[in-house]
Curated annotation (Swiss-Prot):
Involved in chemotaxis. Part of a chemotaxis signal transduction system that modulates chemotaxis in response to various stimuli. Catalyzes the demethylation of specific methylglutamate residues introduced into the chemoreceptors (methyl-accepting chemotaxis proteins or MCP) by CheR. Also mediates the irreversible deamidation of specific glutamine residues to glutamic acid. SMART domains: REC (SM00448). It comes from Pseudomonas syringae pv. tomato (strain ATCC BAA-871 / DC3000). One of its GO terms (molecular function) is protein-glutamine glutaminase activity. This is Protein-glutamate methylesterase/protein-glutamine glutaminase 1. The keyword Cytoplasm applies. The active site is at S214, H241, D334.
Length: 390
């Protein structure tokens, strides 16, 4: 069945171009367009699209306000278009706070110069988002800044029942330590193929926690990091697929919400306990055995800048078995090869479970490759990090 898309933008040119690009994919049908947030709400209610593309700056009602109304009245995955500026980054993070799933830079130059690349990226996003699991969670909300409850109530964006306790049937165990060989079969059916044990991975003197993520990552990272205490004993490195103009604003926002310190990484930064360094967009981040960070130019041959595999690989080389790595929600398979290197030197690899992912791509790649030592629900990862490291 084709993915139904509603295109919302006050620019006639942009509406037409997005419609043309999406209509070229046989799996996508544009069911309607809107010129402002008010029309977007009306069209969403009438057409019930699978995905909505949304501009921010529009007359009558802006995109963020429209997203909030849509999430309250007819929850639908929203892909935001945003400008590549610091203000655009702030607005985009606000949109994710309101409930949007993901974003793309609104770059008219790219549409003209690289139409095939734009088509591939946009259509891939739409198709993936249409299959996504939605969770209500806000960046910057007061509730999100507090540790998540052990068994959260279902939200307006999720029909999932509350996670059962460890005593409940195994089919819905939200957090489990998995024998690597059993992981793929267990996760695919939500029922372990072999007996598994609930609880936290074996405690080890970790020298580094490395977390990689993509689509859905800004919200997921906030969920995890806000549960860590100020005295968290290990340094952290964060790799989030994000444009260069966005990572500084995102790091600043996380720093305000978290008890630990968070900053955009700079070349020569020193790793220290209770500090999370976010890889800068458009570049690559590596760590060395002296406990310092190296920031390198983004390699055009690589799809991702920053790339989880690059950072994980350097961590494996520099810290051996003293790395605890976590792969969160995201499209694609970035992180799999880096996790493979980490496993080869004896480090620990965790993956987010399918039910709590916005896009079950990167964690699925870890699980299918039999690299996951444990699979945890998003709400449980922060707690398990504390238990494993403190």
């Amino acid at each position: 069945m084709a993915v139904k898309v509603l295109v919302v933008d006050d620019s006639g040119f942009f509406r037409r171009r997005v419609t043309e690009i999406l209509s070229s994919d046989p799996n996508i049908v544009v069911v309607g367009t809107a010129t402002n947030g008010k029309e977007a709400i009306e069209q969403a209610l009438a057409l019930k699209p699978d995905v909505i593309t949304m501009d921010y700056e529009m007359p009558m009602m802006d995109g963020i306000t429209a997203v909030r109304h849509i999430m309250q009245r007819i929850p639908t995955p929203v892909l935001m278009f945003s400008s590549l500026t610091h203000e655009g980054a702030r607005v985009t993070l606000d949109a994710l706070d309101a409930g949007a799933v993901d974003f793309l830079p609104k770059n008219f130059e790219d549409i003209s110069r690289n139409p095939q690349k734009v088509k591939q990226l946009l259509c891939e996003k739409i198709n993936s988002i249409s299959r996504s699991n939605r969770r209500s969670s806000g960046i910057g909300s007061a509730s999100a800044a507090s540790p998540a409850p052990a068994a959260p109530a279902p939200s307006t964006l999720s029909s999932r029942a509350p996670a059962p306790s460890a005593a409940a049937p195994a089919r819905a165990v939200p957090s489990r330590t998995v024998a690597p060989a059993a992981a793929p079969a267990a996760h695919a059916h939500h029922t372990p193929a072999h007996p598994t044990t609930t609880g936290t991975a074996k405690r080890k003197a970790y020298k580094l926690v490395a977390i990689g993520t993509s689509t859905g990552g800004p919200v997921a990272l906030q969920r995890v990091l806000t549960q860590l205490p100020a005295n968290f004993p290990a340094p952290l490195v964060l790799i989030q697929h994000m444009p260069a103009a966005f990572t500084k604003a995102f790091a600043e926002r996380l720093d305000k919400l978290c008890k630990i310190s968070v900053k955009e990484a700079e070349d020569g930064d020193v790793l220290r306990p209770g500090l999370a360094l976010l890889a800068p967009g458009g570049k690559q981040m590596m760590v060395d055995s002296r406990g310092t960070v190296k920031i390198l130019p983004g390699d055009e041959r690589l799809n991702y800048k920053p790339c989880v595999d690059i950072t994980f690989g350097s961590a494996a080389k520099s810290y051996g078995d003293k790395v605890l790595s976590v792969v969160l929600t995201g499209m694609g398979a970035d992180g799999r090869e880096g996790a493979r290197l980490l496993k080869q030197v004896g480090s620990t690899v965790w993956a987010q479970d399918e039910a709590s992912c916005v896009i079950y791509g990167m964690p699925m790649a870890i699980v299918k490759a039999e690299l996951a030592d444990a699979i945890y629900s998003l709400d449980d990862i922060g707690r398990h990090l504390v238990e494993a490291c403190l």
